[in-house]
């Protein structure tokens, strides 16, 4: 994000209110191109034969948009489906401009982040981006809580809701008009079945900008309700948006006055100073030390917030009330739970000795072994029972490439699940990947696994055994014994900014 300040060279007032002219600036699309939103091939290529993008394509596309809008009145034309600007086989212009538009709309969010960091005196915020940074917070604060609300945040059902929400963050009317055109035109040629896959796979940045603006509005009101219901109001309401694209939010609440007054009369009855809120992957957790009536009250507030402010119908099962000690949470690829660990303490007074049972509350994180094996089976590393099989599609690669790919997956999983308190599940995953690699190599050479390993030597798959130790030796180089002890403990890394594909159970060949 630091590139924006170098490329844009605009003051803050200009970035807030004059975003529309940036659509015609070539470096905006160069930024979107350099970010590598599409891994295989950029959408900004003029055609397959030219490795460059053209600003002229962008200008021509925008000119056609407004000519089309003036001629056909796209918001009110009855024959809209027959007069589409973006046809079913011509989504090139939509992709190109939407990704550039997403880069531009990110500017107000980034400025709010800079202002928030300056006020709080935070020089570097890279560590806050790490997914692992949330687990130490949970360990420190969730162990003494009792109830938890598991909330599935609803998506806006109407396009105008997204536009009205984004209006609070982007003050440029021309950009909002262009966004309205994008969304209505997009809806006209995409069926409901195609919409989610199109946004998630081809327009990720555009999707997250819209989603984050919706989340900002939703959580601003929630922070207000939280402060009104607490004896000690929080001094900072800075929250993190989706960590794929990281922003911060100021202590600036965009509220509807009528909505605030409607809830303020009853909030004083339920004071709860012990409450923590965490959001991840379209879900959120509200943990409290309160009582069941208090949690039901918050459920009532959330349902009314969605229906009254965002016009969203709350479906059954979107909010679940559970006891933290009796239920586990599927959180960012881990299975987390808060339980009581028994601890025996021997106490002696004069000649009498006593053994005291002193259970300790502990927030634990485990590897979800069953879903992880299911992901490995989906990627054809093993069958549904966890028995390793050969990766047939990789047999055309060289031996070194096959070993490197398997080793990279093994290291990434070990790195991501380093915070697990039980490493035995990781040993099983390593065994599956190691044997799958051996069977893939044996299949390539038309041999058995035993014969291939005997011919190649035992050091062929050595990197599977030493991957974690090498990482720990680099981190703690003083003594090998220290590394072995740390390997058995939980380690949270601050360089993990996205969930491993296997952990999120969404596999594809881009895993490696």
Curated annotation (Swiss-Prot):
Which InterPro entries did the record assign? Domain_X (IPR024937), Maturase_MatK (IPR002866), Maturase_MatK_N (IPR024942)
Keyword Chloroplast on this protein? Answer: yes
Q: What is its main location?
A: plastid
Which Pfam families does the UniProt record give?
Answer: Intron_maturas2, MatK_N
Molecular function terms from GO: RNA binding
At the top level of its lineage, which domain of life is listed? Eukaryota
Q: Where in the cell is it found?
A: Plastid, Chloroplast
Q: Which UniProt keywords apply?
A: Chloroplast, mRNA processing, Plastid, RNA-binding, tRNA processing
Q: What the protein does?
A: Usually encoded in the trnK tRNA gene intron. Probably assists in splicing its own and other chloroplast group II introns.
Name under which the protein is recorded: Maturase K
Organism ancestry: Eukaryota, Viridiplantae, Streptophyta, Embryophyta, Tracheophyta
Encoding gene per record: matK
